[in-house]
Amino acid sequence: KDKARLLSQKGIDGFFLDNADVYYHYQIPEIYRGLMTLLHEIHKENKPIIINGGDTFISQAIKQNALKGIVNGINQESVFTEINFKDNTFGVKPIEDREYFLDYLDQCKTYGFTVYLLEYGPSKKIEKDIKAYCQSNGFIYDISHSLQLYKPF
């Protein structure tokens, strides 16, 4: 909580919480409670909170209606695309995996979250599909053709 306060005092305009997918790997009450405690502490700073990934945690918290008024949005990477980290290439997400994420994003939208997508290196056809899907659902998206997101383009 001290770090959240210090960051707020520095003038940040919101929090982007990464690695909430730890709950996917360790689906135990202690991890869930830890994430909820962290979110409640950060929320005290009255800044928007966006969670990156963490679909298993978010889905569980939605079932418990635990995030209303606390979390503003979610960012999901690689819904339509996927990354092969062994050779740093991009591909198309298998349809069954994509369907899972499309259902998840629909839950998030229905719950009231602002939804963000980040996709990597799609073909022109997949890029058109991503744009059409996001525009029809009111989602904010970015498409990167590089894994080096820290570099200006």
Task: Indicate residue ranges for each PLM-predicted region.
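Glycan-processing catalytic domains of CAZymes
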Residues: 1-153
